[in-house]
């Protein structure tokens, strides 16, 4: 499907798994920050400035939206991979499982999860105010159409990135938006994912997260005047046409985790993929153990 209003917007939605793979490999599209922020379509700048993916004040973008040709890409990915290699503990798993069993509210769960996953980036306890603000950034474009929600999301994004800029400092390899994004992902996406796990202790997490994908879309921007191998009646406009991969639909269709954590292949899949799956599986196992240890209900 294509939504095209001359001089206003040009967006193409692709949900077929094989088409997504083919377009991704074609070289016709790239990550959004292939172009300078000021040159991107107006609605991209408007929306992403209120998300965890972009720091408008410092003009910084999350790693997944940077082209692989960016000079800092390899260093940033290596830093994240190194930090992810620091595993969680059994005590972390048990604590989170107990919180889920007790039906702790999302705000408290997000705070505790941030200590497990994101403390490794800042070397200190992440304040509750920051994990709360991280939950307020935009998740969908529709939310950006609500003025009060948009203003609050911009403020929340600024507060989280300001905290990360202070905590990470200028001397380390940590990137402000990469750290801020991970805090937001834990506060919003991991919290939701573990609720899903707690509600279904029998289905393996690999099947859960393809049947119910956590990320539904991935944006790309045209870098060539192309009709995408005949899919389009008219060519894309480089630097203007945005292609939205409906990776959630592709994950459900194919049961392929590389659509849950990327665009259908291991290249540039989420750095946290293995950590995330292992942690979710261990929490699921701990919850099963708690359930089996629970005394039986008295007969009536």
Task: Mark where each language-model region is.
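Catalytic cores of PAPS-dependent sulfotransferases
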Residues: 15-24, 28, 69-84, 88, ...
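Central I-helix of cytochrome P450 enzymes
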Residues: 159-210, 272, 280
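Short, amphipathic alpha-helical segments that act as regulatory/interfacial helices
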Residues: 115-122, 191-198, 281-288
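Cytochrome P450 C-terminal heme-thiolate binding region
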Residues: 13-16, 200-300
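Charged/polar, low-hydrophobicity segments characteristic of intrinsically disordered regions
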Residues: 142-163, 178, 207-224, 300
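N-terminal membrane-proximal hinge/A-helix region immediately C-terminal to the signal-anchor transmembrane segment
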Residues: 1-49
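Conserved aromatic-histidine-acidic binding/catalytic patches
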Residues: 11, 102-110, 148, 152, ...
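Cytochrome P450 catalytic-domain helical core, especially the substrate-recognition surface
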Residues: 37-126, 130-167
